Every structure is written in structure tokens, then in C-alpha cells.
């Protein structure tokens, strides 16, 4: 996968040379390049922002600078009104006002050949930028990573990039480690809690069933704990489950937790 990142702080992404991300690049699974947006400016101050039209606090990133940068990285030979070239990357902007980035999005994007991330700063980028490239046929995505605001898009891009790339074949040393993670699969649940040795630490014991050696009982315990944790922390995920996909033990656990499971989707009895 080829990944281009545009930022006014490209050095922020030197961290991508560490750990599994660095190993993936060394193996040729990833090609990551960070670009400095200021390289496409023409004034002595290398300005990338201007005051907001209509007034207001802060500064807004200028479309002229972004368009020169994106035209080049997207492969537009004739920028004005030309359609997106074949094989153009998916263009992704972090935006706190956009739909939430989810594991489903990460899974979809992990199959892409080329991703281009644009990191906003200040009050953000001119709203016409994503609109323009959508109109040219580019696959433009805008995502939020949560209900909060950051100083810039670099942190959000790092979060999305790690969530996406770790799903690529060959990225993880043990591919089985992602199978039972939180939010994974159609019947997405929060993952069960994890323990390691010693069996008793500071007076707190690992659940006995995990030491039993009975893999069936261990699997059931973990499944029940995942259902219980999800019901408590993210009941919306329980409500999205398909009751037809639940086995008898799942139904029994959910009923004990106060959920009705006779309809298409579980429903809390208190609702």
C-alpha cells in the first residue's frame, strides 16, 4: 500500500518508522511519504492560511495551496475541471464535524492500494476543497475520530493509519491476534478482559476457569464476558446484533443481563 500524507509538520510522521509500522515498510508492505504543504506556496512567508470569509476567530487553510498540492499527488495532468485519473488514491481528511471513523471503515480502507491523507490546522481547511475533488470523481472521505477537537489533523491521521494498516495481510506477526479484538466482525462486541501470569497478583486472582485447561469453558467464559462488558459499556452494539446469529448460550446470557432476544435485534427490557 502506498500512503501519502500532507501536513505543515511532516516531521510528525517520523514515528511511522518505529515498531510494526517500520517493519512493514522494511518488508515492502507499506510505502509512507509525508509532504510539507508549504512546498506548494509561492510567497516569501510560505503562507497556507487566511482569515475566514464572513468573519470569526482563527484562520482557514487556503484552497489555492491545497489544490496545487493535491493536483500533483492525485496525478491531475490538467487540473482545471479534469476528471480524476485512473488509479487515483482515496483522499482522506480528518474533520471533527464528519462521520465517526469506525473499524468497518478501517477494514474497507485496508484493501486500498493508495491512500492520501490531508492534515488540517487552525480552523480547518476551506470547505470547497473536498467538494471540488468529489466533483472531479475522486473518492473523498472525511472522518472524525471522536467528539473532541485537536490542534491539527496529524494525530487523527496517525490513529486512522494505524487502524487501517494493521489489518493488512502480513502486517501483524500473529494474524490471529486481530480476530477476537473489539469491534471486529459482523457481530462486533468489546473484547473480553485479558490476564497473564502470575495467577494471583496482589491478592487478585485470575478467574479459575481460565486455569482449567477446558478450552470450551474458556471460550464460553470469554464470550459471556464480552457480551456483559458490551452490554454495560456499549449497549448500542448489543442492540445491533442479529438475534438469529446468537446461539442458545448467548441468548441465555443476554436474557440474564436484562435483554429481550425474541425479535430481530436484542432490546433492553427496561427500554
Curated annotation (Swiss-Prot):
Primary residence: cytoplasm
GO CC annotation: cytosol
Subcellular location field: Cytoplasm
Catalysis performed (reactions): guanosine(37) in tRNA + S-adenosyl-L-methionine = N(1)-methylguanosine(37) in tRNA + S-adenosyl-L-homocysteine + H(+)
Binding site for S-adenosyl-L-methionine: 120, 145-150
CDD domains: TrmD-like
Protein name: tRNA (guanine-N(1)-)-methyltransferase
